[in-house]
Design a protein with these regions (language model features):
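Conserved thiamine diphosphate
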Residues: 1-18, 166
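Thiamine diphosphate
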Residues: 17-182
Length: 182
């Protein structure tokens, strides 16, 4: 499970606690984006994401904390933004709908690109027979210099500016290179 803010973290922790089986919650170091805390702790349906913004051509699939940067970047391109919430199981119905209605899907996660959530999305797209263009944004398989969280996100192309660069490259038809940063 990959919460995008403090409220979702609380609800996903509740979801994991009530789930009859193993559960893991990904969350970044430091503080959250500052979401106001709602009083309820209702669990979320396992394996269900949520569309946070409707757009055209490009869909940004945010796993966890990068949701805020994805929403900011989406404004410049009228992109759809999905809060995926779950790495396993993936929301296959939402993925199918996004693959049918968009030219490009870009996964965004604060995790390793190789073997991460984006890889799981690409495996599912291939197995389901979707030929949509896909890109993965995440932490490349190389040393990331020490720094504050914002600087490290920028280094990996996981800030709003980096996401915008990736969208622009994808729309221009530039080929993706595994592990590249925006």
């Amino acid at each position: 499970m990959a919460p995008s803010d403090e409220n979702e973290c609380r609800r996903l922790l509740t979801t994991g606690f009530l789930h009859n089986g193993p559960a893991a919650v990904r969350y970044p170091r430091g503080s959250g984006p500052g979401a106001s805390i709602s009083p309820g702790l209702e669990p979320l349906p396992i394996g269900r994401g949520m569309i946070r913004r409707r757009g055209r051509r490009v869909a940004l699939l945010a796993f966890g904390a990068p949701l805020a940067a994805a929403l900011e970047a989406a404004e410049a391109f009228d992109a759809t933004v999905a809060d995926m919430r779950f790495v396993k199981p993936l929301d296959e119905a939402m993925l199918a709908e996004l693959a049918r209605t968009h030219e490009i899907l870009i996964t965004i996660e604060e995790n390793a690109i190789a073997g991460g959530a984006g890889s799981a999305v690409n495996e599912w797209l291939a197995a389901a027979g979707f030929g949509v263009r896909a890109r993965q944004l995440g932490i490349p398989d190389r040393f990331i210099p020490h720094g504050d969280r914002g600087a490290q996100l920028a280094e990996c192309g996981l800030d709003a500016a980096g996401i915008r660069r990736t969208i622009l490259r994808a729309l221009s038809g530039e080929k993706a290179v595994l592990g590249e940063t925006a």
